[in-house]
């Protein structure tokens, strides 16, 4: 018998009818499973991706299920800021006066080619971090009072600090380093967003999570041949999850009552997990936040009136240390 992500997450009996959720990168992998789960729970789901045929298939699957869920598909290339803005606009229209209840920042991947986007930013960093940052910033005023922002990160975030000078160059490019840097940015972004919202007495929460190593997602399509072949065998190992299992933590953070007031934290397997020391550094989180606005050429979101970023208490502490290597797609 198939076990759905919402059942694994312990929220299979919840109903979130009249709520709206955006799941980016939801035409395959854990994004698709997350979108289907939220649809089964009754939400109106904005499905996002670049493959229109795959997107329509997810919409049909949600609307064909025996529940009250509905869906629509919006195509957007996350390497293009204008398309991210169009996705934000379409989501705003879908949410209406009730606001957006759930934002799952899941789109991303592992890209082995050294290249810059049209904005002059290293491609992996732009797609995996800068576009989720932009999308979230553009939707801040459209979030419901108790909305939840969930960002797919990875245990792959553990590594060197982010060198801001590397973000606009591809000299000595390393695909793994680019991926690791983008995943560290995901954890730092989620923590900083949580802090800035909390400093404004907002009930909106922001958390990140590690989904597990998932060969069934689209992560491995960009790996070099030998690595891709080796990765394909990971699905036979017991510590590697399926897309449905990987989606369970996203669904848990989006729906479960017990985390309604939890913000700025990092999760794995539906439990808080301590991220890297660098990921917890509030100064590094603040620098990334400010640099991201500069790279996009926009005003700093949620900037304090006096120009400061608020308190310096670190987010993401606590939890267990188990979990396998992760990816987002």
In which residue ranges do the predicted regions lie?
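Rossmann-fold NAD(P)H-dependent dehydrogenase/reductase core
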Residues: 2-218, 298, 302-308, 321, ...
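A short, mixed-charge helix-start or loop-turn motif at secondary-structure junctions
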Residues: 24, 171, 175, 232-236, ...
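Short, amphipathic alpha-helical "lid/cap" segments that border enzyme active or binding sites
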Residues: 27, 85-88, 243-254, 282-289, ...
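C-terminal helical subdomain
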Residues: 182, 208, 232-273, 282-283
